[in-house]
Amino acid sequence: MASILWTTSLKVLLALIVWIGTTIIYNIYFHPLHSFPGPVLARATRLYSAYIRAVGLSERKSLQWHNQYGGIVRIAPDELSFNTGSAWNDIYGTKSRKSQRLQKDPHFYMGATAPNGEKNMGAVGDEDHSRIRSVLAHAFTDTALHAQESLIRAHVDRLVQRLQDLHGKPTDIVRWMHHHSYDVIAHLCFGQDLDALGSKDWFPPARVVFEGIREGVTLIEVLRFVPFKATVLDILVQAFGKARRENFNASVARAMLRLRLAETTSIDFISYILRVKESAKELTRSELTANVALLIDAGSETTATMLSGCLFYLSLNRTTLEELTHKLREDFRTHDQLSLQNLAKMKLLTYVIQESLRIYPPLPATLPRLTPATGAMINGVLIPPKTRVGMNAFAAYHSTQNFADADMFIPQRWDNTNDRFARDQRHVHRPFSLGSRGCLGKNLAWAEIRLTLACLLWNFDVILEPGQEEWHGKQLTWFIWNKDPLYMRFAPRTK
């Protein structure tokens, strides 16, 4: 009996070894993507890319690989990474024929289902996405933004006041920016002021946002190798997703309270949604809550990251910081003059924000797509069907093929009259993506960043604490940046 068991086990082991070896040989030499360059381990097995992503090294490795292999890199047996400007349009741009469209990778977005079972706008198919986006878009028009300016400004003023109360003591600006951005987006969504800034420690809902994204990305990579993925995901979410469910349920309660008011003259997002009366477009309550939760998660995390990165790189580059601070205080004699209309005309402020979005993109990772059954022409190359493809933002923005002195913070590169950067591939820079699934809140993000940054520099002398110089350089990524505390001082302005 023991002999039979031993023989059977040996046969199974040998069969497994043969299967693994055959798969590796096929992936390297015979797979439809075999001709594309990339690391041998990545071409041989998806385990390598899954490991790289799970430990937070994906973006650093992508940059290294693109520098080594060029504009197209095979980062897994069935996946290609791009870092060129033309690839943006080829992958994410709008296609006239449905059969030519690259769809979102269903595995990557399988976790984009809210606890109520509803998929948010980021994960639904094209038709539902178009319907939901057309409804939400009413809350993001220029007219809506003009009406929302006073609300954003009130939150910025409160941030300034709270920082003034510190009297120049060192503080973790990452936490402040997360609380500030969460207050703004939550107030815009629900018409309620949650005052996360008033929390002495991390405001739990704000922390859940980026912790949930980080843990979710790791889980999705692990699930690539597990059968019955959807069932396993549901079990794990039920077992370990308590904080996420509580956060979502709180959002549902606030949304339901706001809906009961049924008032459409406010400036919050729900008021604009309620004005859409076309029955074919109206959102169900479960769709509304799932997408409001998405707006809060996406809006608070990315804006907080943008502001943290911008303040960090400005404080590292004192000449630019002093120039921008002087310009703000010279052009605007009173705090009340810092309006969106006035700030939009300030070129240096715009250049600083653009450069911050390049060197420290709030979403540094790849948004994966699948090529259609007919394949797809990307970067002038025919890519086989059912291939995972995507632009890696960090690798694209830090490539010396795209930007001169790519690792240096130089806002002047965005000045069209600067010959030094005339060969920069500026069309590569798409921090809000593009096409029909590009960021809906782009203008709102710009408005919040402009107002917040301008008011902080107008009111304070910003100083980076010693020992914080490598804050960005040592960060890992799990789709978003894993931000350590960033200690800075906001001293009352001296002139």
Curated annotation (Swiss-Prot):
GO terms for cellular component: membrane. Its EC number is 1.-.-.-. Keywords: Glycoprotein, Heme, Iron, Membrane, Metal-binding, Monooxygenase, Oxidoreductase, Transmembrane, Transmembrane helix. Its main location: membrane. One of its GO terms (biological process) is biosynthetic process. It is a single-pass membrane protein. SUPFAM superfamilies: Cytochrome P450. Pathway: Mycotoxin biosynthesis. Glycans are attached at N249, N317. It is an enzyme of class 1 (oxidoreductase). It is found in: Membrane. Its cofactor is heme. The chain crosses the membrane at residues 12-32. Cytochrome P450 monooxygenase; part of the gene cluster that mediates the biosynthesis of the diterpene glucoside brassicicene C. In the first step of the brassicicene C biosynthesis, the bifunctional diterpene synthase bsc8 that possesses both prenyl transferase and terpene cyclase activity, converts isopentenyl diphosphate and dimethylallyl diphosphate into geranylgeranyl diphosphate (GGDP) that is further converted into fusicocca-2,10(14)-diene, the first precursor for brassicicene C. Belongs to the cytochrome P450 family. This is Fusicoccadiene 8-ol C-16 hydroxylase. It comes from Alternaria brassicicola.
